[in-house]
Amino acid sequence: RVVQQLEGAGHTVDRLHLDAEGFDPVMRGADLAGYARGQSADPAVAHYQARIDAAQQLVFIFPIWWEVMPALLKGFIDKVFTNGWAYKPSKHGVEGRLTHIERAVVVTMMNTPKWAYRWLYGNAVQRALVRGTLRKCGVRKVQWVALSPVRHATDAKRQAWLQQVGAMFGA
């Protein structure tokens, strides 16, 4: 539905559906051997990097499992956000290279109440993805929308969430 809303608002959408595309999230020995140099043995990495290079905005939509993103998305970030492409080492840590991305939006769904996720479980998505990856890689504007709790959400609540996310893109 979010893709339909974005397209309806005039945005061009390049949807990455990692599972449907058969993305392999596993960092194998050959990948690890070239990791520090920003090299990957997986030919799909350059393909995904080119798609991100063409983007102005990134939207991540995923459920939170065991307080973090699913392994498929984590593996995507590990393999695709490489040294020299997404960031480069600097004397102060890293210098982000994805500065062409105007904005990233992270939309998550979980059953844990938002207050518990933040105060009891340490807000892992904020630390790992928003600050620890996207901002570190040069994306200055990152918005996170946590839809919660989903287990008992009514249809009306779910529709309100879709409208909330759509409104972020002028839909």
Regions found by a protein language model. Name each.
Residues 1-85, 152-171:
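N-terminal beta1-alpha1-beta2 submodule of the flavodoxin-like/Rossmannoid cofactor-binding fold
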Residues 83-88, 139-143:
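Short, structured loop/turn "capping" segments at alpha-beta junctions
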Residues 55-56, 101, 139:
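Short, well-ordered alpha-helix to beta-strand connector turns
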Residues 64, 110-112, 148:
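Residue-level signal for short, function-critical loop segments
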Residues 79-83, 107, 136:
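Short hydrophobic alpha-helical module
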Residues 119-171:
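Glycine-rich phosphate/pyrophosphate-binding loop and the adjoining helix
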Residues 14-16, 59, 105-107, 143-145:
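Hydrophobic/aromatic beta-strand patches that form the interior of the parallel beta-sheet core
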Residues 88-135:
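Short, glycine-/small-residue-rich phosphate/pyrophosphate-handling segment
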